[in-house]
Swiss-Prot record:
The keyword Nucleus applies. It comes from the Eukaryota. This is Transcription factor mfmI. Transcription factor; part of the gene cluster that mediates the biosynthesis of the phthalide-terpenoid hybrid 11'-O-desmethylfendlerol. It is found in: Nucleus. Transmembrane segments: none annotated.
Length: 472
């Protein structure tokens, strides 16, 4: 189980409505084209792979006083770091408000790792190449967006590095609220639609509140976002902004997992008919086996299982072949599977309920969790544990029991759950005659499992339980 845990699902989205000034356009071009059009280069000597040092990413002084080549920062996930001259170039850019350049430097630095940090499946998803530009451009003309990006990015790093968020970001937070209130008075007067960029800022406030464990505030902002979407004409008006829509739904789903509240967008999505049909089932080779294991299970649950199983097969193939799926497919599967599962109701302690919660736990690890910081969902975790305790029986196939326990371990359970989880896993591993990690992998893969997302933590859990085996 992971060591860094926070609640909720903050967003990182942006969209451009105006053209930035020439200096910023020049900066963006250099940022996006970094590493391209270099011509033939000499082969470089192999260097020892350095360990990611996130503290340097979050240190404003580094970004203004020394180039990335002098630190480990350029090795963080992406291979296209911000140019070494970022400090001097920032001094020529006119931002939407007077701010300390060092605070903006952290935002720009984070923009180079944002997708990788927030989407474990990033290497398998085809995001727009212009996303990096869309991160930067609004900083020049939208003051609310500028201040929002500053306080959300800095507080993200504070939590990631186990630092108590300080008061240095408070002025940016209050400035955002002030600007947003003034803007909503103008945009919400009925003469014009609330802009997508304004919706992005409201979503950021909701995500930040969840990050800071302020649920009431997060709910308030999400309710405001729902009103904005209704004023714009519904969720269909965001179809051209798939990335923003993904983040809206991730935040909505994350709140439901954290508190058990009903998602705010369920009624829109579940009543939208054909627009939320299940995707065509992806081809898999294990339908016969699943039909046997899930005999007597609700038909819609079995269909949901097949959709997720096929999606996992597709992602594993993409990871192996180094290809990508459209982000719209990620959005469609996430929405159609997770909102339906949350809307289903079965008897407490029933096999249907156990499978529903198992699929939700698995889906949360695929669609909601982050790469460097694992979300904590106390309500759902307790609900799943209780259902496991009530429902897991000796006549259930041990392989299915193993999958259900491991899914919880890699998605929602924490170190506090090890006391009851590890002995149970030890017993099931013995029943399945598991001796090596590859033995466990084979069983998990026969159900559904994404190595890119689950293998690292899964191996840690296996090693931990194996050590328990030796000491018993």
């Amino acid at each position: 189980m992971a060591t860094t845990q926070v609640s909720g699902m903050p967003f990182v989205v942006s969209t451009s409505l105006e053209k930035p000034d020439p200096n910023l356009r020049k900066f963006i071009r250099k940022h996006v084209m970094m590493g391209k059009n270099r011509g033939k280069t000499r082969p470089t000597k192999k260097r020892e792979k350095k360990v990611l040092d996130l503290s340097e990413v979050a240190n404003p002084a580094i970004h203004l006083t020394k180039p990335p080549a002098a630190s480990n920062v350029s090795l963080i996930v992406t291979r296209r770091p911000i140019p070494p001259r970022v400090g001097s170039e920032l001094s020529t850019v006119h931002f939407a408000d007077d701010v300390n350049l060092s605070t903006v430097a952290v935002v720009l630095r984070f923009s180079s790792i944002a997708k990788q940090a927030l989407f474990p499946l990033e290497t398998c998803i085809s995001f727009d190449k212009g996303d990096k530009k869309q991160w930067i451009e609004p900083l020049a003309f939208d003051a609310a967006y500028l201040h929002t990006m500053i306080f959300t990015t800095h507080d993200y790093f504070n939590l990631l590095l186990h630092r108590t968020p300080g008061g240095e970001t408070s002025p940016h937070f209050f400035k955002t609220i002030q600007i947003l209130r003034e803007r909503l008075v103008l945009e919400g007067n009925g003469r014009s639609k609330v802009s997508i960029l304004t919706a992005s800022v409201v979503l950021a406030l909701a995500g930040h509140a969840l990050l800071m464990n302020e649920y009431a505030s997060a709910r308030h902002h999400m309710e405001g976002l729902r009103k904005i979407i209704d004023l714009r004409g519904g969720i269909s008006t965001f179809k051209g902004s798939s990335k923003l829509l993904i983040e809206i739904l991730r935040c909505d789903l994350g709140m439901a997992f954290y508190t058990g509240s009903k998602p705010l967008f369920s009624d829109i999505l579940l009543s939208s008919g054909p627009s939320l049909l299940y995707p065509e089932p992806f081809p898999t080779s294990s339908h016969c086996k699943i039909d046997q294991l899930l005999e007597g299970i609700n038909d819609e649950l079995v269909t949901t299982w097949r959709v997720m199983e096929g999606f996992c097969s597709l992602i594993n193939l993409a990871a192996k072949s180094k290809t990508r799926i459209p982000k719209e497919m990620f959005l469609d599967v996430m929405a159609s599977v997770m909102y339906r599962l949350l809307n289903m109701e079965f008897d407490t302690g029933s096999m249907n309920e156990l499978i529903r919660l198992g699929l939700l736990a698995f889906s949360s690890s695929v669609f909601l969790q982050w790469k460097y910081m694992r979300m904590s969902y106390p309500h759902f975790s307790a609900l799943y544990e209780d259902c496991l305790m009530r429902t897991m029986v000796s006549n259930m196939p041990p392989q299915l029991q193993l999958w259900l326990l491991m899914v919880g371990a890699v998605s929602v359970f924490t170190k506090a759950d090890e006391e009851w989880l590890r002995p149970w896993l030890h017993q099931i591993m013995n029943s399945c005659e598991i001796e090596l990690w590859t033995d466990m992998q084979d069983i998990l893969d026969s159900f559904m499992w994404i190595g890119l997302v689950h293998d690292e933590l899964g191996k840690e859990i296996f090693d931990s339980v194996s050590l328990l085996t030796i000491t018993i």
